């Protein structure tokens, strides 16, 4: 049987029409299918799977083949603990060049004073941010006040006392039900809540918006060392000038987690007081959501934190992933193009089109709409748990995720809402007309779900049903859309057996 690459080259005999990234990608698949068939087939099946669903999970996107190819090389074999030009290993000059270029690109793209590009994930970036703040604002001053040069010089008793004191400092962040992330300190099962005394602020239950006066009131009362702003399920924008003032008034460090909206900052959608960069002391982000890069994280900060961040090893990191850092550099360079700016604006336009159609059809959206890339549908009036809505939409080829809403009585597993996002569909090239179609499909599915309780295991095990006619119609409409906007159109799936 001819290889995937052979068939591709035969089908596109004109060399000027051949895509070099496609050639490289298919060549790697050929090798894996031959040498490690089970792994190769799983990769092929995942490609087919992603091509057969409308990806509407707000935290997911599609990276370029260039980004993917950068991760598949011998850079993965190099240990490089430390920071560029200050490594704990020898022979790191090539990794130094890549990491330095990645950091400089990040600084230019976001207007940051310093950039640390090693974190393996957004959670790692957030952990590094809080550890850097603790080190810079609590630990180092305390060590100096005690008359020592470094924390390693402290006697055991004083060291234990300092650890206990650090854990008493307060951190104020958005609660999970109000749209915050589990790494924002308000989830006790997460390590963040164990590093400081973490307090939540909530959205106003009437407006479902964050109330700056209320945040200021809580901050004034508790005087936190850290004020966190960011979200994983909030469909509006923050005013970072206001949050900076709140932080200054109580002497707090302002840390912004822009994992979800970094691409909207890079693309010039969030500007002025909606851009966190001029106001925040530390900004963290992932690189794989609206930035369309590899899975990973970044920390952007004021210069005063640069030295602490560059000591992430041994603070909380070991060896970085140089092959992923190379891919981050490529994604950041892609984000500097005019095409990316157009993309970022289209992401928000598409989300707002979805919102308009949903509201026109009587669905209730948290906050009444969206100003960013996501929206959350409150399913309470439909009597459909988020878990069941997620399952039923998945069954017709639409990937969303269940999501809690403020004061959610259904809990974290069932939930009363679903979250949807437009980054991935916009990457495929879809626009307002397609969003109208997608929204109408979703409305029809949601309004035709029948919820049935499992008598043996109770209502918590209830299941959803959708008539075959409705389901088949939805699947066909989804297939029609995907047929017009294929993922990686340069890769011919007909050759992937």
Swiss-Prot record:
It catalyses: (6R)-5,10-methylene-5,6,7,8-tetrahydrofolate + glycine + H2O = (6S)-5,6,7,8-tetrahydrofolate + L-serine. Coiled coil: none annotated. One of its GO terms (molecular function) is glycine hydroxymethyltransferase activity. (6S)-5,6,7,8-tetrahydrofolate binds at residues 176, 180-182. PROSITE patterns: SHMT. Pfam families: SHMT (PF00464). Signal peptide: none annotated. Its cofactor is pyridoxal 5'-phosphate. One of its GO terms (cellular component) is cytosol. The modification N6-(pyridoxal phosphate)lysine is found at residue 289. GO terms for biological process: glycine biosynthetic process from serine; tetrahydrofolate interconversion. Keywords: Amino-acid biosynthesis, Cytoplasm, One-carbon metabolism, Pyridoxal phosphate, Transferase. NCBIfam families: PRK00011.1 (NF000586), PRK13580.1 (NF010094). Belongs to the SHMT family. Catalyzes the reversible interconversion of serine and glycine with tetrahydrofolate (THF) serving as the one-carbon carrier. This reaction serves as the major source of one-carbon groups required for the biosynthesis of purines, thymidylate, methionine, and other important biomolecules. Also exhibits THF-independent aldolase activity toward beta-hydroxyamino acids, producing glycine and aldehydes, via a retro-aldol mechanism. Homodimer. This is Serine hydroxymethyltransferase. It comes from Chlamydia trachomatis serovar L2 (strain ATCC VR-902B / DSM 19102 / 434/Bu). The lineage of its organism: Bacteria, Pseudomonadati, Chlamydiota, Chlamydiia, Chlamydiales.
């Amino acid at each position: 049987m001819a290889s995937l690459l052979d068939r591709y080259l035969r089908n596109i005999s004109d060399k000027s029409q051949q895509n070099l990234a496609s050639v490289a990608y298919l060549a790697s698949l050929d090798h894996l299918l031959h040498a490690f068939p089970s792994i190769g087939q799983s990769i092929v099946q995942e490609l087919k799977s992603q091509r057969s669903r409308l990806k509407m999970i707000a935290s997911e996107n599609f990276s370029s083949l260039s980004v993917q190819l950068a991760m598949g090389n011998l850079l993965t074999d190099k240990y490089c603990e430390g920071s560029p030009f200050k490594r704990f290993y020898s022979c790191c000059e090539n990794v130094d060049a890549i990491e330095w270029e990645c950091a400089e690109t990040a600084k230019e793209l976001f207007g940051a004073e310093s950039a640390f590009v090693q974190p393996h994930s957004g959670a790692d970036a957030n952990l590094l941010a809080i550890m850097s703040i603790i080190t810079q604002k609590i630990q180092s001053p305390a060590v100096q006040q005690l008359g020592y040069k470094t924390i390693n010089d402290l006697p055991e008793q004083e060291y234990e006392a300092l650890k206990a004191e650090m854990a008493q400092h307060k951190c104020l962040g958005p609660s999970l039900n109000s749209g915050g992330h589990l790494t924002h300190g308000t989830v006790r099962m997460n390590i963040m809540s164990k590093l400081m005394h973490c307090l939540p602020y909530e959205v106003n239950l009437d407006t479902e918006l964050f109330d700056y006066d209320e945040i200021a009131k809580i901050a004034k009362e508790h005087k936190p060392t850290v004020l966190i702003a960011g979200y994983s399920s909030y469909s509006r924008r923050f005013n970072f000038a206001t949050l900076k003032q709140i932080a200054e008034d109580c002497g707090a460090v302002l840390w912004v987690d822009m994992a979800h909206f970094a691409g909207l900052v890079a693309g010039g959608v969030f500007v002025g007081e909606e851009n966190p960069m001029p106001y925040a002391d530390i900004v963290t982000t992932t690189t794989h959501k609206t930035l369309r890069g590899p899975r990973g994280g970044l920390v952007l900060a004021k210069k005063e934190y640069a030295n602490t961040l560059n000591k992430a090893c041994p603070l909380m990191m070991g060896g970085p992933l140089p092959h992923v850092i190379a891919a981050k550099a490529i994604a950041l360079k892609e984000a500097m193009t005019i095409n990316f700016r157009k993309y970022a604006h289209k992401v928000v336009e598409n989300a707002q089109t979805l919102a308009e159609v949903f509201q026109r059809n009587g669905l209730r959206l948290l906050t009444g709409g969206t100003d960013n890339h996501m929206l959350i549908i409150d399913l309470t009036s439909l009597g459909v748990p988020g878990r069941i809505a997620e399952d039923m939409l998945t069954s017709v080829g639409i990937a969303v995720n269940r999501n809690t809403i403020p004061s959610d009585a259904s809990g974290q597993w069932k939930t009363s809402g679903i979250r949807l996002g437009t980054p991935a569909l916009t990457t495929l090239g879809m626009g307002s007309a397609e969003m109208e179609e997608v929204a109408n499909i979703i409305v029809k599915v949601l309004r035709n779900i029948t919820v049935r309780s499992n008598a043996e295991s109770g209502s918590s095990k209830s299941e959803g049903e959708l008539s075959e006619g409705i389901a088949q119609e939805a699947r066909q409409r989804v297939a029609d859309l995907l047929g017009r906007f294929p993922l990686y159109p340069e890769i011919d799936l007909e050759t992937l057996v």
